[in-house]
């Protein structure tokens, strides 16, 4: 897995220098994002399918898809440059468990996707994200949002749903009524 993460890092630096795909501009920044993406493996339940909303340059989906190679990942990203990059990464890393779609969550038919885990990183307010993505989550599925310290201003959440590592707050919650 390390060799593939190193190749992903190389590709992101190469493409990023031309296309401005991410705020990560060097190996250290990308390694930090990789570790941030994988930190959740310490507390999330096993899953068979994941919908990553607003995949951007591939965090957290690419590192997670490498670590959880038996799970199926669907990446939603509306930006054409980022989608082209994600397709390039998929081919270069031979990620057969990845499906990439160029679209926004608002344009996906709820009948077309049903997953165990929904991930998103720095996309939108947690309450809005739950409202948009809940139709795609299986009954016993989980939301996993990579957020900052402002999470509790976005949504009422129990302490066991908030995992804090440094400045990052991971919101991990089973499907429930968030009203």
UniProtKB/Swiss-Prot annotation:
GO cellular component: cytosol
Source organism superkingdom: Bacteria
Binding of S-adenosyl-L-methionine, residues: 54, 59, 105-106, 121
Keywords: Cytoplasm, Methyltransferase, rRNA processing, S-adenosyl-L-methionine, Transferase
Disulfide topology: none
Enzyme nomenclature, EC number: 2.1.1.170
UniProt enzyme class: transferase
GO molecular function annotation: rRNA (guanine-N7-)-methyltransferase activity
Protein's cellular compartments: Cytoplasm
Keyword rRNA processing attributed: yes
Pfam families: GidB
Protein's UniProt keywords contain Transferase: yes
Reactions catalysed according to its record: guanosine(527) in 16S rRNA + S-adenosyl-L-methionine = N(7)-methylguanosine(527) in 16S rRNA + S-adenosyl-L-homocysteine
Similarity comment: Belongs to the methyltransferase superfamily. RNA methyltransferase RsmG family.
Cited function: Specifically methylates the N7 position of guanine in position 527 of 16S rRNA.
Name of this chain's protein: Ribosomal RNA small subunit methyltransferase G
UniProt gene name: rsmG
